[in-house]
Each structure stands twice: as structure tokens, then as C-alpha cells.
Swiss-Prot record:
Pfam families: THF_DHG_CYH, THF_DHG_CYH_C. Catalyzes the oxidation of 5,10-methylenetetrahydrofolate to 5,10-methenyltetrahydrofolate and then the hydrolysis of 5,10-methenyltetrahydrofolate to 10-formyltetrahydrofolate. Pathway: One-carbon metabolism; tetrahydrofolate interconversion. It comes from Desulfatibacillum aliphaticivorans. NADP(+) binds at residues 168-170, 197, 238. Belongs to the tetrahydrofolate dehydrogenase/cyclohydrolase family. Homodimer. InterPro entries: Aminoacid_DH-like_N_sf, NAD(P)-bd_dom_sf, THF_DH/CycHdrlase, THF_DH/CycHdrlase_cat_dom, THF_DH/CycHdrlase_CS, THF_DH/CycHdrlase_NAD-bd_dom. CDD domains: NAD_bind_m-THF_DH_Cyclohyd. Coiled coil: none annotated. One of its GO terms (cellular component) is cytosol. It catalyses: (6R)-5,10-methylene-5,6,7,8-tetrahydrofolate + NADP(+) = (6R)-5,10-methenyltetrahydrofolate + NADPH; (6R)-5,10-methenyltetrahydrofolate + H2O = (6R)-10-formyltetrahydrofolate + H(+). Its EC number is 1.5.1.5, 3.5.4.9. This is Bifunctional protein FolD.
Amino acid sequence: MSAKLIKGTDIREEILEEVTKEVAELKEKTGKVPGLVTILVGENPASVSYVTLKIKTAHRVGFTEIQDNQSPDISEEDLLALIDKYNNDDSINGILVQLPLPKHIDDKKILNAIDPDKDVDGFHPVNVGRLMIGGDEVKFAPCTPAGIQEMIVRAGVETSGAEVVVVGRSNIVGKPIANMMVQKGPGANSTVTIVHTRTKDLAAHCQRADILIVAAGVPGLVKPEWIKKGACVIDVGVNRVGTKISEKTGKEIAVLRGDVDFDAAKEIAGSITPVPGGVGPMTITMLMVNTLKSFKFANGLM
């Protein structure tokens, strides 16, 4: 019997409807709406596309959205001054700096200059520390891990006491989702193991997982025999493995493959995310959730 599909596209729509409704209610109550600014340096095509999607989503849910495009020649000093301007703008609740930045600019210095209370990506060291402490200290969880946890909860997967194995140790996904799943609270209370591509007998670790979260960036890494029967499998990998011609547009598009052998795994797992259409749509969705939270914190509503 095939596994239940956990579709990020469906969950995204549920959450964005909830955010849109709450924004409308807050506007009626306070006369204000959340503000989100995305700073784009240069014209990297992938970055332009991603920023456009963020701005469109912010507009859809009723935010004030600003796309601040800057020349690739902007100095580090001027970019820091721009961030400082938005840090001190009460109408802005979320500040995003789209990466990658030009080589003459220090990414870490720029990202660390963002006010932690407006760091809706959740990557400022202050927010990383808050996440580690857990509980009421947490303001913004990083968007992809937050999306993963939300998918697990909304799919009705039991996490309390569950064996969770996270394959991958990045600061963006692996480490934060492991930390989130081990905390006290809904969607957590799990027993968590972090493994990676250098782990000895990786398959044996995966085989005992009730919830297997794979974020290694290796296409097809996890084989069906690595999966416990009935497990929940969250495939975070989005690996470009070739191109094909789209039947809809006739244009060349990327062929994407996850870190899990999906076709075989879905016959063993109890639930599984597809690639594409699984975890991917959740990242921008949770960015909207974090921006709404920031607005509520700023206005004494949380």
C-alpha cells in the first residue's frame, strides 16, 4: 500500500489562508499591517526569481512589501547603512537580505547587522541561541525547519517519544530541526539522532527512525531498505539531476530529485513528502508566519 503523501503545496494554502485572515483582523484592530522588506543586491536570475516569489506571497497575505534593489557595486558600508535604516523603521517587521552577495561584501557581517527582532529568516546568532534554549525564548525558527515541523504536525504524525533521525548537519536545516524536535511541546518531545554522510553504518540509524528527515543534498541517498515500515519520511533534498522539456510550456526545465528513492520508499513508508511539491513550498510560507509574529511582538500582541 502506498504511503500517504504529505503535500507542502496543500499545507501552504491552508497556512496562507490563516495568515491572510489574521492580517485582515489585525488591520481592523490596529490600523496597521506587517511590513516585509527584501534587499536584492545585483541581478542574479535565481535570486530575482526567488525574491519575486517572496514579494508576491507577502502581497497576497496583505503585508506591506518592499523590494529594495541595489547595484552589485554597492559598498559594504552602504549596505550596512541601509539595513540600519530598516532596523529603525517601525513599519518594517521583517528584513531579508537575499544571498549570495557580491564577493566584496561579508555575508556574515551583513546578516548579523539585522535586528534579531526583525530577523524573520531566523539565522541571527541571537535567534539561534533562542532556538537552542527553546520554549518562550523562541521568536523565529528558521523557515525550512519550521515548515518541516508544521508538515509533521498537520499530517497527524505522533512526535512525542518518537525516534527521529535527521540525515544532515547544516545550520539551515539539519541542526535546527534536530533541536526543535527534541524540545518540549507540540510537534516535539522526540528522541533525536543526527547523522550525516560520514556516519558509520548510516543505513542502520535510518532503519530505526519513526520519523526520518533527510537533508543531505545527495540525490537518492536513502534506499527503501533503509526505511522502517510505516515511518514518516520527510525529504528536504532538491537536487537538479538533468533537464527536460515541459509538456505545458515547451521550454527546458530542471529535473529535480530528492535525497530519498521516492518511488520505492512510498511503498514502505507510512507517509512521505514528494519532490518537488513537498518541503519546498513551506519555506516562504513560514517566512510569512515569522513576519506576522514579528508584527505581533512589536505591537504587544504576543
